[in-house]
Amino acid sequence: MKPDFKAIQEDKEISLLIEKGNEVLKALGYTEHSRRHAAKVSQTAGEILEKLGYKDKQIELARIAGYMHGAILAYGILKERGMALEYALTISTAIGHHDEKTGTAIDPVSAALILADKTDVRRNRVQNPNQAQFDIHDRVNYAALKSDLIIDREKNTIQIKLEL
């Protein structure tokens, strides 16, 4: 099976896993990781690679990794749906390496995922109602009214523009 972002996005099991995961994170007071965040990260990861001139296959893999970036079970789910081993490994490896404390960009897909995830900065991602208990993610997101990513292929730069 070729990578197909639309099929992944419409997959009921994947959608339920994302939403249930967000319910748990919300109960623990963590920043929002709903389907909305997944869709934003997916769109941005694909846009990064597209604007930098990568091939459609890598763009699609980045979009899938962006959408599923909170799904610990991504590899098994993708293999179960018939995705080729090479693609399932690229996606699950990117997901496993996107955490800011332990992760590192090992290929264009993982680099795009890291940038896309960290640039979804907006006040309505904060789920913790108690400002005194905000963690660093809550404080950054709460301060931002809007964020835009500016990708300049000619200058080989990516910038984030925040409206506070």
Protein language model regions, located:
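Acidic/His-rich, divalent-metal-binding segments that scaffold phosphate/diphosphate chemistry
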Residues: 1-71, 76-79
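Serine/threonine-rich low-complexity intrinsically disordered regions
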Residues: 2-4, 84, 152
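Residue-identity detector for glutamine
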Residues: 9, 43, 58, 127, ...
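Histidine/acidic-rich helix-loop-helix segments that form or flank divalent-metal centers
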Residues: 82-142, 146-147
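Short, aliphatic-rich beta-strand segments
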Residues: 147-164
